[in-house]
Amino acid sequence: MVSQRSAMIFAILCLFALPLAGQHQSTKPKPRVVVVGVNGMELDILRPLLLQGQLPNLAKVIRNGAYGKLRTVSAPNCPRVYTTMFTSTRPEEHGVTGFLVGGITANTNMLKEEPIWSILSKNGVTVGMANVPATFPVMPVNGYMVSGMLTRGKSCEDGVLCAPKLSEVEGGDAVYPKEMKAELLKNVGDFYIDCERMPAAADLKGHESEVINKWLDKVQLIREQQTKLFDYVLTNHPTDFTWIVQSCEDRTGHWLYPIAPFNVGYNPKIETVRPDAFPDQYIQFDKVLGTILKHVDENTYLIVVSDHGIKPLREFEETDPHAHMDHEKTTPVIAKHDFADGDDVPGAFFAMGPGIKRDLRLMGFEASVYDIAPTILHIYGIGQPEQMRGHVLSEIFESSENKVALQK
């Protein structure tokens, strides 16, 4: 009698449990994705450091995921490429074609296509953006946004890279929501939003050692501040989707490119002052990546991307007195790149996470900057908008099916 009664009670409990189980499945947590951008990082340059064991954190990502070269756009520069990654559309379609557009510094008001953070926000995904180029002024998201490169501050000229502190921002908002600015100033400090631009040739002559060492010290300070910002938002403002960018490698790489035969502007007075600076920038980034990896568990997707590879810029400054000017020779820009063809300077792509193949090398140009947004949407089970020109990097997944269909 007791056993029959127990069996009946158990059956009743099971019946009650069935809808609860179904309810639990319908509220399955959204995937967590962390994208780490690095300005100007090239896979071929990283290989010697990886073989020497000097990039242990990046090596961990490679062992546990997929990696390869990342095809970029023609005439690649940071705002042009990052906005292509955000939208998976051509620069002429999304509107941000360079540092200057119509004589005005590139900004989010120029966007003609919907960026990834807007699509995710509308689909209920919480979003965090920190120090990402071409995100000034910040836009409303389902989370937070802290702008990056091309944020305008006091004494910033149109089109010129400058490093305003958070308290010095002018002409728009650098933080969304606005009240988060005071929180960051209190807990992270009055950090530099972007990395210091390269010194001009005229500032170097006769003072190479002093100027270079002072500049590199400033670069390291900014890198440490950016790391503190990343650690703070990942700890105190966790989101389903986070995109953060480390920007210092681009400046150091362009300016201190050490390989004499490939650097028309090679100057031994500059390169011999700090021969460690070029490889050290990637070693320092690996330490930044180590901090980020503390926030990445086995259920998190980590994607590391660079907008383009690296080539020297200083040669133009040495040979062309108007290298920092536009065609009217009135508006300063940062410099002219020596690579109109993006395939000359491919970026790099690394990804690991649930269902991503391990130790998979993508050969040739299987991955493109156009593919980043579609692949992120795929992870969240969100359909790819018609205007996007990229495709899902299905080859990196063990299964081609959408990871999770969002409950709406």
What are these regions (language model features)?
Residues 26-28, 33, 44-46, 216-242, ...:
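A long, amphipathic alpha-helix that forms part
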Residues 107-112, 279-283, 333-347, 358-373, ...:
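A short beta-strand-to-alpha-helix junction
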Residues 7-19:
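Bacterial N-terminal signal peptides
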Residues 89-269:
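His/Asp/Glu-rich, glycine-adjacent segments
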Residues 301, 305-352, 406-407:
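Histidine-centered active-site microenvironments of extracellular/periplasmic hydrolases
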Residues 46-84, 92-93, 126-130:
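Short, structured active-site-proximal loop/turn typified by the sulfatase FGly-forming signature C/S-X-P-X-R
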